[in-house]
Amino acid sequence: MTQNVGFCAYTDDFTFFMDGGVESWAKSPESVIECINAAAEEVSSLEPDFILFQEVDFDSTRSYHIDEQEILRAAFPQMAEVDAVNYHSAFLMYPLTQPHGSSNSSMVTFSSVGITGALRRSLPISTGFSKFLDLDRCYTISRVPTENGKELVLFNVHLSAYGGSDEIRAAQMNMLFGDMLAEYQKGNYVVCGGDFNHDFTGNSTQVLNGGEMTDFGWAQPFPAEMLPEGLTRCDNYTDGKVEP
């Protein structure tokens, strides 16, 4: 199970300033707590063995310094956990009407069985202004032993949205796919989930916007042609269809 909780700001009426919207902070502290609890409840209802969260804030201006990590830990107390900070900004004085402020955000992986090792891998990012909203992009690699001596290797990823030249996107994909392929070639089981910041299915902007195609600029088509042999993607979550 994977979910980007969006620093627990995205109520139905929230519009983020970097997507052409208005707000740079969540609506209120109460709204943040309500959103993180709702996310935890929804995920818990599905009883997943593995959970991959992105944009989990702690001590951030935009989410009123609420520790969303601690709330998730309390919701899944029996699960093993791996955290990695992938967004740290001392203070962003933009937008001027409501500065984004200081930000700390992480990716959190939960597992119902023990994790024997984990690694954080830094991704290449833009060097322009957008890097101030795209700091420390990374993915985590978590290792879970199996009965046959192989490992289940979980990749929790959050790729760039706003940085995004074609070169940066390609470099991030090549790095991720290279690490996944290396594990697959060792005979390990490999699962990758997270926020790719791409149009993963080919019609995701339409599905998520009431049937209307919407151009977000950053939601480029997922480069399925870059997938190495042996790796597949699931692009239809209803019937479990897997497309090579």
Predicted features and spans:
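Surface-exposed cleft-lining segments at the edges of enzyme active sites
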Residues: V22-P29, V56-F58, L123-K131, H158-R169
